[in-house]
Every structure is written in structure tokens, then in C-alpha cells.
Amino acid sequence: MRRSSRAHHDRQFGGEGASFGERRPKRGSQDQAIGRSRGGRTTKIHALVDEEGRPRALLLTGGNVADIKGAEPLLATLEASKHTIADKGYDADHLRSFLDDRGTTPVIPNKSNRKRRFPFDQALYQLRNIIERTFCRLKDFRAIATRYDKTARNFLAGLCLIAALC
């Protein structure tokens, strides 16, 4: 019996070698927190900050991922606080119940299309500019404002380094 010199055909059609239908994952195919949005390929930085604007937890997602998707994993990393202040992008029943279960008061304005309205402390909500100032300080560094790093791990490492400096 003569063996074919084209051994790759055996694997391609279910012969010897890899099991049929099984493929090697693409190199670099793991999540690199790059998403497509109107502005092109982007990365979204989710952050928890304390009352002085120091980042306590950071998370990266693709730019096309909704803000609410990063909220619970980020909040689960830290102990519960008295209040959690967030913008309208975080107004969801499941997040409010998650915060209530932790004993935290959500200070989140209602979305315009919300049927059931929740009261929120507008004076406390004014403190939300602390996180906006934190993002401004972080993005003063060009490497953060314009993501040059290919991998999410390297970008997050640079972000953590800069957050420690700010």
C-alpha cells in the first residue's frame, strides 16, 4: 500500500490525525478586548474609584460591549460600599437588585424609557464627576488614550501602572 505524500489531506477529511471537525484555535484568538464601534476598533475601560478618585478596580471590554456587562464582575471584586454612583448606562433592574443584595444604595438616574421610576439622591450624583476626572487623568497619557498595545494584558498592565501614579 502506497502512502500519500499529502498527509494534510488525511486530517482535513477525517483520516488519521486530528479528530474529524476538530480545529486548532487561531493564535491570538483569545479575547483581546477590542470591539468594533462607530469610531473603529476600540477598547472600553471600566473602573471603580474611591471618593478621592483613586482607581480600585479596572476591567477592559471591547468598545461594542454595553457598560452594564462590566458592572457586576467589577463590583464583585471589592467589598460593598455605602453608595454606588453610576450613570444611566448602568440603570438595569438586575444591577439594582445586585446592589441591594450587597447592602449598597444605588445612586443611578433613571433611563428615559424606564416605566418603573426609582428615586435617587441628586446631590450624591453630583459626585459622579470624580470618575470622569479620573478618566481624564488616565487619558492624559498617550498610551492609554490611543491604545498601542496589541494584547489586553499589556494594555491593562500599562493602565494599572498609570493608575498607581495618578
Feature locations, PLM:
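Short alpha-helical elements
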Residues: 1-166
